């Protein structure tokens, strides 16, 4: 009787372990793609970065507009200093996108002109099993309102 109870438990354990191994591999592979993509942006290779977007994104966007927007953003951010992953997550379904393999990555980044920048990347695996960028977003704190930053003399 004990063997009959242990067998399903063993099956569930092996199945969950297998699933976790694949999730970890998907996250690792997607992270490599995202890191290369971010490096392309930080090195002003915007056209190469744009080509890493999924076909659906490229069909629904204007590459000229995106290239100008990302260039302006990087000028505003200033020179890239450092970046580390703060969270990563695998999902097999996303509302509005359907079933598939998706990885969310969140980075804590530092650029010359901003205190801290959180960068968010969503990647999806296409039908050729290649990871592609689906979305890039960010939030940041500007140095402009830094109380520690000296204000210009206002003639006091």
Regions of interest found by a model, annotated:
Residues 4-15:
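Sec-dependent N-terminal signal peptides
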Residues 17-43:
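Short, low-complexity N-terminal intrinsically disordered segments enriched in polar/charged residues
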Residues 31-32, 47-100:
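Short solvent-exposed beta->alpha transition segments
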Residues 88-156:
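Exposed beta-sheet edge and beta->alpha loop/turn motif
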């Amino acid at each position: 009787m004990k063997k009959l109870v242990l067998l399903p438990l063993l099956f569930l354990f092996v199945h969950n372990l297998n699933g976790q191994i694949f999730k970890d591999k998907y996250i690792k592979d997607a992270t490599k793609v995202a890191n290369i993509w971010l490096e392309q942006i930080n090195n002003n290779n915007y056209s190469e970065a744009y080509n890493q977007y999924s076909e659906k994104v490229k069909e629904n966007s204007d590459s000229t507009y995106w290239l100008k927007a990302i260039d302006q953003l990087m000028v505003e951010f200033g020179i890239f200093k450092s970046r580390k992953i703060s969270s990563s997550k695998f999902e097999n379904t996303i509302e509005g996108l359907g079933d598939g393999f998706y990885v969310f990555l969140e980075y804590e980044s530092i650029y010359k002109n901003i205190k801290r920048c959180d960068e968010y990347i969503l990647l999806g695996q296409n039908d050729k099993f290649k990871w592609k960028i689906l979305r890039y977003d960010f939030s940041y704190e500007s140095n402009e309102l830094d109380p520690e930053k000296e204000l210009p003399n206002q003639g006091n």
